[in-house]
């Protein structure tokens, strides 16, 4: 069985969430059936959104340090749970010595398998402005809907003032309005395109048809490591948050 290397710390809770989803997605009867996982919880990685918006330091040097440490420790391939960090992947790839599985491409391919034609993106401002999901979905022939500026701000605040701040309760009225507006615009499902958003779905009981990019990546990683997935994500028009985010 291959060893998974997780470039983590973006943020720490999201890193734990990805690792937990890998463990829960693995068909295992005993400890020895589980996949070896190495995690570099590098909290020195600068904020990715700030870097994309030209307001902060590039995360590339620290991302590369994490990749090198994981490679040296024996990882067979790399993943990272931070959607926004994938914007910098082209700058990392020339220096990586082992394969990297992209959360963005994996999620886009999953949307295609479901037969979706139009999806909404719930993500940080950095991810929305980076164009990473727009390019990946366009490549597989799927239209993407982005939140309005007000919706983007509401989602950003929920991520930073809610989940990252460790708040167990948070007023999501503006976020729920954003979901309703995007549904009216034709969104068949929503990609949870920031690693904190699946946590927000669970913590703050958001309602909608959600595609958890973290869960999709976790199941892809399980397969790539040579283990069996205990339960495949459903291939249907919509995937409810309870089906993806809570098992």
Regions found by a protein language model. Name each.
Residues 1-247:
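Non-catalytic structural scaffold of enzyme domains
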